[in-house]
């Protein structure tokens, strides 16, 4: 039974419900999108749907054991974080030609970031593993701010795609900065499981749902523009 005074447990519950609501919203709103944007909204719904399932399990682990649901959390991230980079690829592919190499660079970097974090949180060289995870994240930031992904976005010529891309890159830079803070507060003998889980939970709440909202905004905006253009030329 969830104790109303258990801050960590309450955050697990709130975020479970929020992820379910977001999944329903993105699924329903998919009908308003056209073309490749439908796929983008489907992936956004997959991200929050997968997260909702894992958050219900993580809440149960926390309530029953009082311990951090480490494995469930990283399984969730290993599924949802690569999907978020699929979103980056789909945004670019919606308006221009994108190389498969860009997709794999982002995918491999995101998986490396997570694997280093998991190994560190399991207690094996937590500080070096944490630093390696941060370096993988920094590479991702380089790619989306100054690398191939950034250049492809600048040349796309699609206003909705460019707006979404610019918003998402700031989520990955500012929003994702919360995760290393939680990691370094939680590892080591003085680490706090409560602080780590509250920080991770709030970060997931902001980053997963905000990611999807950005996609939804771009999808509905671009779809409305295309519909208006079609009516004007009819």
Q: What annotation goes with each model-predicted range?
A:
Residues 21-25, 87, 116, 136-160, ...:
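Alpha-helical transmembrane segments in multipass membrane proteins, preferentially the mid-helix core
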Residues 51-74, 115-121:
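Helix-loop junctions on the outward
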Residues 143-146, 167-234:
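C-terminal transmembrane-bundle signature of multipass membrane proteins
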